[in-house]
């Protein structure tokens, strides 16, 4: 009998494989994405010091009251995290898509972050 594939387990394996190759530094931190069924979260992380430099999510007060599709809200999260990162002096980042396909909400967030000043 064929066992059912757990998509999240496959994603976590893919993410672990990618994380072995990616690391954020103080000069070029990592933009990490987490996507749930309802929300999306983005963090700019300096892996050397283990600190989060900037973050944004759809659960924040200013974004939680917004209406629109999940893709539109993801773009607003990308815009917000890019502005917060640039306030901290971050211009270039390493994009960590968290094992998710570069499509839909993840792509919208990345494009919005690029349009608002982050380079990757």
Curated annotation (Swiss-Prot):
GO terms for biological process?
translation
Q: Does the keyword Cell cycle apply?
A: no
Alphabetically sorted, this entry's keywords are: Ribonucleoprotein, Ribosomal protein, RNA-binding, rRNA-binding
Q: Which GO terms describe its cellular component?
A: cytosolic large ribosomal subunit
Q: Which Pfam families match?
A: Ribosomal_L18p
* Domain of life per record: Bacteria
GO function terms (MF aspect): 5S rRNA binding; structural constituent of ribosome
| Family, as annotated | Belongs to the universal ribosomal protein uL18 family.
Give the quaternary structure. Answer: Part of the 50S ribosomal subunit; part of the 5S rRNA/L5/L18/L25 subcomplex. Contacts the 5S and 23S rRNAs.
What is the stated purpose of this protein?
This is one of the proteins that bind and probably mediate the attachment of the 5S RNA into the large ribosomal subunit, where it forms part of the central protuberance.
Against PANTHER family, the record matches this protein to: 39S RIBOSOMAL PROTEIN L18, MITOCHONDRIAL (PTHR12899), LARGE RIBOSOMAL SUBUNIT PROTEIN UL18M (PTHR12899:SF3)
Q: What is the name of the protein in this document?
A: Large ribosomal subunit protein uL18
């Amino acid at each position: 009998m064929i066992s059912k594939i757990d998509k999240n387990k496959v994603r976590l394996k893919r993410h672990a494989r990618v994380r072995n190759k990616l690391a954020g530094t103080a000069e070029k931190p990592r933009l990490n994405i987490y996507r749930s069924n309802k929300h999306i979260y983005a963090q700019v992380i300096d892996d050397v010091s283990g600190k989060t430099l900037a973050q944004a999510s759809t659960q924040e007060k200013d974004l939680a009251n917004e209406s629109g599709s999940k893709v539109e809200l993801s773009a607003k999260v990308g815009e917000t995290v890019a502005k917060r990162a640039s306030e901290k002096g971050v211009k270039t980042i390493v994009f960590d898509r968290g094992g998710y396909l570069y499509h839909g909400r993840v792509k919208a967030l990345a494009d919005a972050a690029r349009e608002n000043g982050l380079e990757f």
